[in-house]
Amino acid sequence: MHLIKSVKTEYRPFFILFAGALLVHLFLPLSWSDDAVFAKEASELTLAAFLNGSSRLLTDTMTYVFARHPFLWRMLNPFVLTILAVTISRLLACKNETLKNTVICISILYPAMVLVDAGFIATTVNYLWPVTCGLLCLIPLQRECRGGYTKWYAYVCCIPLLFYAVNMEQMCVILTVLFVGGFLYLCTQKKPSLYAGLQALLCLASLYYTYYLNCVGDGSRMEREISRYFPSFLQLSVWNKVELGFSSTFYCLTMDAAYASVAFLVFTLFLAVAVFRKSSKISFRITAIFPPAFTVFFVISGLLPAKAVPFLSYVTGGMHQYLVAKATYSFAPLRDLLFIAVCICVLCSIGMLMCGKQARLTAFVTLAAGLGSRMMMGFSPTVWASGYRTFHIMLLTFLFCAIMILNQNPQLFIRKEKPVEIFST
């Protein structure tokens, strides 16, 4: 207790997060789902044999090591979890640092330690760790976009981190867009960046390498997954895959009684409370309350007997069946229109809560990145089989937006503060 009191107030949430996570990790079960499979394979195979046919060499190497020595993971993962919290805090500015850090430390536990449907080791090493590495790589880019420069040791640290981050396909695409976009932006400002350019090239090369390993050749990973999870996947057009990514994402967020809908409900309730506290206009309040009300209604409807809600299958287009069987594709216009309405309401609420065009644009781009990270699963036959862990990045963007809103609306604080710039320098 004395040690905690000796730490500065704004840093105490990180200290408590690390200590609590370390204690909990000592007792986590590691013998279920993919963790059990990998533990068996790692005990029987050499590393070279384990990596045979792998498209994620670095993450699978770490999976192999931790499957053989799980105590190492129990010691290291709390450290990575804390690094993620510190990195998010570094990227986002807020006058009330203690509140910001507390919200971050509590919020990251959900995607990092609850959405672990592949097992704790497999999910964290393949999702939590790449996201953490990717966000660390964005700190120098943020600094350069704000007029700073990148020191030599940032190259030494961030290039290896990038190689690990791009082992996760979703993070590879997101980082490619961000680094290419950042490099082009700096060029337009007549400040071309060696760091952004180098990282953009590495991301593009990794993107091609990932595509080659996953999709090229007989017996590729893509072919195996199509046969196992989505036999009709090759019949889908590009438009079908985009629509599948969109509808599957919002089905899980608003209609499926599981982890993703809980996170979306909390986020939209936060938006609704903020809107109600900021404005008394009935139109704003109706817009804000629609997404959480929609989610509660359809999640509860999905738990009722089919005879009690005969309209549900018509609205969902049969999506409720895909989670437990080989997937097929169906297009339901009403379902997509409802999802679009939810999107518009969320954007309107955020737009109303953010002050200034730049702040709104930043929030919208952040949400778009999160949505895009999940929508790209429409281009994978494991769009359903991958489970809720593919929402990891999207749920973190909810957290990013929540911190932005807290910063832009001092009246939500216990102690009123003047808002500062959205992203820290």
Report residues per predicted region.
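Start-transfer (signal-anchor) and selected internal transmembrane alpha helices
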Residues: 1-22
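Transmembrane catalytic cores of multi-pass membrane glycosyltransferases
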Residues: 25-72, 172-173, 187, 192-349, ...
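Membrane-interface micro-motifs in multi-pass membrane enzymes
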Residues: 56, 104-142, 325-349, 373-402
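Transmembrane-helix motifs of polytopic, lipid-linked glycan transferases
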Residues: 75-101, 136
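Transmembrane alpha-helices and membrane-interface helical segments
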Residues: 83-90, 136-143, 178-186, 267-274, ...
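Short hydrophobic alpha-helices at membrane interfaces in multi-pass membrane enzymes
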Residues: 143-163, 193-198
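Membrane-interface alpha helices of multi-pass inner-membrane proteins
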Residues: 152-180, 204
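Signature aromatic-anchored transmembrane alpha helix within multi-pass, membrane-resident enzymes
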Residues: 287-292, 340-367, 371, 410-425
